[in-house]
Amino acid sequence: MQPRQPGDEAKQLAELEVVRQMMTPTREVLLELHESFLKELQRGLEMHKRHGITWVPEECSMKMLDSCVSNLPTGAEVGEAYAIDFGGSTCRAVRCSLLGKGKMEIIQDKICLRSAEHRCAKGFMDKKAGGKELFDQFAMCIRGLMDRSGDLKKAEETNTPVPVGFTFSFPCAQAALNSSFLIEWTKGFETGRENPDRVEGKDVAVLLADALQRHNVPAVCKAIVNDTVGTLVSCAYQRVPGTPECRVGLIIGTGFNACYVEPEASNYGYTGTVVNMEAGNFHKDLPRNEIDVEVDEKTHNRGKQQFEKLVSGYYIGEIVRVAAVRVFGARAPEKASVRHSIHGETASTIRDDHSQDKAASIQAIKECWGVTMDLDDIKCIWEICRLVFDRSAAFAATLAVALCYRTGRLDTGSTVGIDGALYVKNQWYREAVEYYTKLVAGDAAKNIHYCIADDGSGKGAALIADVN
């Protein structure tokens, strides 16, 4: 970095104060967000009543999808259930031993779908790969796990197929609990696009059932599950005795989403009671600032996922970078002008550095931007990270409070299940969520309990298959 000139320190502190004002929402701002979100939620329910599974973005920014899940576990269930967790280049087969009293044991097997041994460059993700090839991997993975656990022989001898939940984290139109049509691939998947054996437009439950039959796997797909819904269900089973029932689920990680139990679901045309909101796309009356606008304008999906861009780990690093360039002005490192040159994980490392010398933070910035900052400058970066993460926690907490209110449980008590690395891995983030919950909810905050649903997607899918 360029050495300080006379007056630079005062300018830097003044700009930092501007960023602090931008990134510190007042209680009044959060209450306005709370009301705006509830109004948009209501518009979404009315949209679903009119149009069913068809999303009409002009009527609601959130999709408000029917999960088709009605039955939630109590924690007393016992037995074995399986899940296939598929949402990226790695697929997992998961076996849950439900022990009752909210306890469970997990074993799992993983496969990499970007296989170097596959004939196509991107493995089973490649556009020239066929759908049967991909779904055969799922069937073989779960068969191997069933064999290893002894369940395969038992199911064959008793002619009793095991229930399987299928976490399929791609855009789908859910027609029933065990019927979901892939709208389009995301996350780099193109399977079947240049192969007669396509996947897009097909019912993934049928594709899985066919693969299980081809490989003689005594299993039946009971449910297609979104990872956010799985989080709610997982915490419904594992919540601490004496705490309220889980009625809200959040993902706060690379992305953001929310689901909740809608008390009037049937009145709005839902077959289940759990609504998958796709809340990352919420954008009505958001308290955005000029830094947020700059970040959004340079994304590939400008104008979309606006709430997610304020909260999720994927965008936090970019918000920190843009804020830092503003604060340091002409002294900003050259590499700081490169988009995504600091990631959310790096910003988290800096925020987590409570040492006096900030050695970990200095090293993190050196790796990102190729400069060694002095202590004053690195403390400035640390403060920017704190502000951005705290605002994320404030907005996430506000939505959690709003959803507890919508479920009708704010006064009597509700548990909020949360998964996602940003929340699960960082105690300081969880503490910030608690702080802002109290700020928004006031005395009612004592009725809101947060539950970590580590691996909610796998556990939740297995539980849904077991109880629905």
From Swiss-Prot:
Reactions performed catalytically: a D-hexose + ATP = a D-hexose 6-phosphate + ADP + H(+); D-mannose + ATP = D-mannose 6-phosphate + ADP + H(+); D-fructose + ATP = D-fructose 6-phosphate + ADP + H(+); D-glucose + ATP = D-glucose 6-phosphate + ADP + H(+)
E.C. number(s) listed in UniProt: 2.7.1.1
A Pfam short name: Hexokinase_1
Keyword match ATP-binding: yes
Any GO CC annotation of this UniProt entry: cytosol
Chain intervals for the UniProt region annotation (Hexokinase large subdomain): 226-455
Residues of the Hexokinase domain: 10-466
A GO term, aspect molecular function: mannokinase activity
Function recorded in the entry: Catalyzes the phosphorylation of various hexoses to hexose 6-phosphate.
Family assignment from sequence similarity: Belongs to the hexokinase family.
Name under which the protein is recorded: Hexokinase
Gene: HXK
